[in-house]
């Protein structure tokens, strides 16, 4: 029997985060995602509740991509459309990102390099880059510790460095929990750039 090409995930978190920043004004967020996979190709639709100063009350990501392996490296190339419903009139709240992930395991350490680019970002932000390096180690069959550090550069936007460290544990085949600390080097930019501890629960179907 052929595997179902569709998968679903529901989630709840103590706060919605994105690119190292708080995006739900320190309030809980719920999310959902549906993914279609066929061979290396995939498409997904993700939505989460948010609360941004520009009035946005949600974020919706529509992604198409392709995964493959080249010389021992896992490659994931994707195009992402971001839309932020509820944003005040006159603010650019829909934009497209281009993303490339390269991953490889070195002994017990799993690594991933991510490069994300847009030529016209949210609100007044224009060209922007997000470059992130992540590493993780399996503590046991159900638990993995990971850490990541990233640089954000943006024309007409804020430049900052972000990092996170945390532990994810599978409770069973469907439920998983994640406890993670997020922080940046620019607390002077506002509360969303300050350090925060985020707990999340996901259900995979």
Regions found by a protein language model. Give the residues of each.
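Outer-membrane beta-barrel initiation region
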Residues: 2-37
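Residues that define the transmembrane beta-barrel architecture of outer-membrane proteins
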Residues: 4, 26-30, 56-60, 73, ...
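Repeated loop/turn-to-beta-strand initiation elements of outer-membrane beta-barrel proteins
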Residues: 6-8, 40-45, 71-77, 107-113, ...
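Transmembrane beta-strands of outer-membrane beta-barrel pores
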Residues: 12-18, 38-40, 47-51, 68, ...
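Glycine- and aromatic-enriched membrane insertion/assembly motifs of diderm outer-membrane
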Residues: 24-81
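Outer-membrane beta-barrel architecture
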Residues: 33-35, 63-65, 99-103, 132-136, ...
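Detector for outer-membrane/organellar transmembrane beta-barrel domains
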Residues: 91-155
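Outer-membrane beta-barrel "beta-signal"
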Residues: 165-176, 191-205
